[in-house]
Amino acid sequence: MWHSVGLTLLVFVATLLIVLLLMVCGWYFVWHLFLSKFKFLRELVGDTGSQEGDHEPSGSETEEDTSSSPHRIRSARQRRAPADEGHRPLT
């Protein structure tokens, strides 16, 4: 009697462990193959370690990083300056 109850509990616990292990492995593979490519998801999770998707930065990621490229800001101001001067009243 106690042998069958123990065996039932063992099978139940083993099944739960296998299901949890498969879920963790599935999320791990989904993260590394797909979700880690998105910068905002990495920031939400706080993953600052190995970022395999950053070896080839895309254009959108380089445009968002304004701290490393002050030339882009300067060129944008220079482009706006002639347009603004034409509308200002001379004093």
Curated annotation (Swiss-Prot):
PANTHER family: SMALL INTEGRAL MEMBRANE PROTEIN 13. Residues 47-91 are annotated as: Disordered. The keyword Acyltransferase does not apply. Keywords: Membrane, Phosphoprotein, Transmembrane, Transmembrane helix. InterPro entries: DUF4750. It comes from the Eukaryota. Residues 81-91 have a biased composition (Basic and acidic residues). Belongs to the SMIM13 family. It is found in: Membrane. The keyword Transmembrane helix applies. It comes from Homo sapiens (Human). Residues 71-80 have a biased composition (Basic residues). The modification Phosphothreonine is found at T62. The modification Phosphoserine is found at S58, S60, S69. One of its GO terms (cellular component) is membrane. The chain crosses the membrane at residues 10-30. This is Small integral membrane protein 13. It is a single-pass membrane protein.
